UniProtKB/Swiss-Prot annotation:
A molecular function (GO) term: ATP binding
Residues where ATP binds: 181-236
Binding site for Mg(2+) 1: 315, 329
Organism whose genome encodes this protein: Caldanaerobacter subterraneus subsp. tengcongensis (strain DSM 15242 / JCM 11007 / NBRC 100824 / MB4) (Thermoanaerobacter tengcongensis)
Top-rank lineage group of the source organism: Bacteria
Protein name: D-alanine--D-alanine ligase
Family that this chain belongs to: Belongs to the D-alanine--D-alanine ligase family.
One of the GO BP terms on file: peptidoglycan biosynthetic process
UniProt enzyme class: ligase
Amino acid sequence: MLKVAVMFGGKSVEHEVSIITGLQVIENMNKEKYEPIPVYVGRDGRWYTGKGLLDISNYKDIPSLLKKCEQVVLPPVPGLNKLYYYPFRKKFMSKEYDYIDVDVIFPAFHGTHGEDGTMQGLFQLANIPYVGSGVVGSATGMDKVIMKDIFKANNLPIVNYLWFLRKEYEKNKEAMLDLIESKLKYPMFVKPANLGSSIGISKAKNRDELFDAIEIAIYYDRKIIVEEAVKDPMEVNCSVMGIDRDLEISLCEMPVPWEEFLSYQDKYMRKEKGGKGSTTRQIPAPIPEEKTKEIQELAKKVFQILDCSGLARIDFLLEKETMKVYVNEINTIPGSFAFYLWKPLGISFEKLIDRLIEYAVERHKEYARNMYTFETTLLLKAADRGTKM
């Protein structure tokens, strides 16, 4: 039986959504094949484990919950595959420090310090198999500026955009507004570069609204991206699963919007019959078959270009009048792991989790084939000559 550390929470404005996703993963995991270990990461970055983390009702009072849990840490030491209790303590009648064995890590983070490559780097250093994209795919999938630059370099259809730094804007706000207006047409969307769930995003139809939108966005990030809005858009999403070039494509969905664009409240706070508070969606998306195929092929290409792994959801915009498709963004750890896009294909949430863990183990074996040493006499020569080369 594999011991799977399911990690959630984190230093992110999407903290609460991550808790829900993490508990959904644990709830739907096959307990005959896996032993789930809940690992909650607090807003301060500290890691906790304990049975109390399994009950969603306990999160109404997190300080009280954490008093019943124990802190753990993951040393970045290859081969340990252990979470150590912290402060470090020795096992009873032993000189060895107490720990929890871990075979696979299943990150269920959303947003910064979890979905952006930071945690993935730690898992990589510790040499533990982990679910989802690696450092590169996670980092590029989180930063909207780098993501859009890569899309543009690969001739993918995207809207016009520009980006700037918070300190550049604060140095001369009017000049930055002038620059944006000279490059882009209203209406526009202003977004923090490194957030998801529509947090910090605003639509601007004129200069005053543009100013207000930027003032909101700079509260969340040092880097801001501004995009031209698609006229009368329809949002369509598609999920991709697999590793390398062995990929599967899900059905497409069309979220039914409550407002002009899906806000955080729309996505997570409005209750849907039979759900845990989510967006109303149409599956499959009611669009022509050729557009469905076009979106599925683009989704696959995005997944490969960013070197993603495991599972991701790619979001698109369709201009209603022309039916032109635009790639919007990728979510390398989508909410609920987009299980609802795979269920109509006969892949239950439980089977989806199985696949993702299998991919994690397979990719880890592939990484193990890489050579990280190279025999050379360089240091011997340096010792003879001193530090000068």
